[in-house]
A protein has these predicted regions:
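Charged low-complexity interaction tracts in eukaryotic proteins
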Residues: 499-525
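Short capping segments at the starts of secondary-structure elements
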Residues: 470-481, 489
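Extended, highly charged
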Residues: 2-270, 274-286, 290-460, 481, ...
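Short basic/hydrophobic patches in alpha-helices and adjacent helix-turn junctions
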Residues: 403, 470, 484, 500-503
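Hydrophobic residues on short alpha-helical segments
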Residues: 465-473, 495
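Hydrophobic C-terminal alpha-helix "anchor/cap" residues
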Residues: 331, 372, 471-472, 498-501
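Short amphipathic alpha-helical interaction segments
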Residues: 488-500
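Conserved hydrophobic residue
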Residues: 35-36, 477, 507
Length: 525
């Protein structure tokens, strides 16, 4: 991915609309069907209950004693994420894949121009306990900033890495950050700590949904470029106040700081995880806050994670889209014609994956299953269907499982595979588990049989023949086709004609139930 870098001054005047990709503007664009607004003052302790299981994003106009503005569950519905990209929900994955091929353009602007640095707090004033951070789950280790996007520079490449992270507040100027799972940030932190160097990090809180999608992508490139590519527009960035990390200039809040060079760790958690259960207490690095910058009218953001209604959470929706992109790429080399991919959000966005393919050669359904299992550790159950099944429909998937699946023939189980340690069904401490593939396709070459056809109301598209006999001499036809061929809107007159034809020609039916005139039958019997 080649990144075009330009100096901001070369694009003046008024080169950037810092409102176009602003979180506040996106929230304001949502209609009543997608946004619930709470104008009345509300204690921070009550926020989580309002958002739990909510199908809408929720905007609180007066949260906590500071009466702060806060929005949550912005990405908790696929329709809202699709709206951020300007497409319909079923078009989302393909649109993201298309934009990832864009050549990114990044423009650095001055600190004076950057809206995210309109207010700058450093030293003792950089107090994270003054932010509207709430307790999300009853047994959490403390209030969490759950919607932060981390920006860190990889010292080996000079690239900026972008990811999604959670911050557990420890004090006015310290947070815990979960770095147990393998990630680019973990690798950068461990390398710096081994060399006795601190790791500067900046966290953006309050970002457009597109930037969150960039945060879940993991690619060996400068990931500021992914933000720019997905925005489908030049990205304005600014250097932070207490480090040289560049972040989007249109962010709502930025929290700057570092992990110390000694690799000091403290207990972090427990926390309600994205699979719907609690994660245990872990020893994680301490993040030391050096600055908080924000817009004049900054909008704070929180993300929904965990609980029984996983499918309505930010984390599940974001994870699902990342899973779909990864699986789609893996399928390109595994099968000739992948049609669609959907990762169910009720499984956390990654454990249950549905794939539709058009089989061109025998065995492609199993190839698809193998590709999915190998593409991601947390892809646990793979369901492959023919393209006539709508993979976004639970009803149709249930029907395919009931009518096209034989367990002794179509179930593939693979054991000893790398998996996600957070899976609560695994033995404690295990990183190896089993995966299952469900081939819900018709056996190759059998999908065109009559018994594989789905009954549907007849369709009549216009007369093509002058008589039923002429239509039959054209080739075997179903009764519906005979009606269409002669322009019948009733069908009973066709029955009468067929009755008369039986006395004239050798009229018969084939194994599929189609009417036909036997070859060399030209006259009366």
């Amino acid at each position: 991915m080649n990144v075009i870098e330009k100096a901001g001054a070369s694009l003046r005047p008024n080169a950037f609309d810092f409102e176009r990709f602003r979180l506040r503007r996106f929230v304001e664009s949502l209609g009543a069907a997608e946004l619930e607004t709470r104008d009345a003052p509300m204690d921070l302790a009550g926020l989580a209950e309002v958002m739990e299981g909510n199908t809408k994003a929720v905007l609180f106009r007066a949260a906590g004693p500071e009466r702060a503005e806060l929005v949550g569950n912005v990405m908790g519905g696929r329709a809202r994420i699709a709206a951020a990209f300007g497409v319909k929900p079923h078009e989302l994955m393909n649109e993201v894949a298309r934009r990832l091929r864009n050549k990114p353009e990044i423009v650095e602007v001055s600190r004076a121009e950057a809206p995210c640095q309109a207010v700058v707090l450093t030293g003792a004033d950089a107090d994270v306990t003054k932010l509207p951070v709430h307790l999300q789950h009853g047994a959490d280790g403390g209030p969490y900033i759950s919607s932060s996007i981390d920006y860190v520079i990889d010292p080996k490449t000079g690239f900026t890495n972008v990811g999604l992270r959670r911050l557990m507040l420890r004090s006015e100027h310290e947070t815990g950050v979960d770095l147990v799972a393998p990630s680019d940030l973990q690798a950068i932190y461990l390398a710096n700590a081994a060399a006795g160097k601190p790791t500067p990090v900046s966290f953006v809180v309050g970002a457009h949904p597109i930037d969150h999608i960039a945060g879940v992508m993991r690619m060996p490139v400068d990931e500021l470029g992914i933000v720019a590519s997905l925005r489908d527009a030049p990205l304005a960035v600014v250097k932070c106040v207490t480090n040289d990390i560049r972040v989007p200039a249109d962010a709502e809040y930025v929290i700057e700081g570092y992990f110390d060079e000694k690799g000091h760790r403290e207990p972090e958690g427990p926390y309600g995880e994205f699979l719907g259960y609690y994660g245990a207490v872990k020893r994680n690095p301490v993040f030391h806050v050096t600055a908080i910058t924000r817009r004049e009218d900054a909008l704070f953001q929180t993300s929904t994670i965990g609980g029984k209604t996983l499918g309505r959470t930010d984390t599940a929706q974001l994870t699902a889209l990342r899973t779909e992109i990864s699986i789609w790429h893996a399928l390109q080399s595994a099968v000739r014609e992948p049609v669609a991919v959907y990762s169910t959000t009720s499984s956390g966005g990654s454990f249950n994956v549905r794939v539709a393919i058009r089989q061109r050669v025998p065995g492609e359904a199993r190839n698809a299953i193998g590709a999915c299992m190998g593409a991601l550790a947390n892809c646990k159950n793979v369901f492959v269907v023919d393209p006539d099944i709508d993979i976004f429909s639970d009803e149709q998937m249930d029907w395919a499982m009931a009518t096209r699946f034989q367990p002794d023939r179509d179930l593939i189980v693979m054991s000893g595979m790398r998996t996600l340690p957070l899976d609560p069904s695994l033995p404690p401490g295990s990183r190896i588990g089993a995966k299952a593939g469900y081939d819900l396709t018709w056996p190759f070459g059998q999908g065109d049989r009559l018994v594989a056809r789905v009954p549907a109301p007849p369709k009549f598209i216009g007369k093509r023949f002058d008589s039923v006999e002429a239509a039959l001499r054209d080739g075997p036809k179903y009764f519906e086709e005979l009606m269409t061929a002669v322009g019948s809107r009733d069908g009973r007159e066709v029955l009468r004609i067929l009755g008369g034809l039986r006395d004239k020609v050798a009229l018969d039916r084939d194994g599929e139930g189609r009417y036909f005139i036997q070859q060399n039958s030209t006259g009366s019997k």
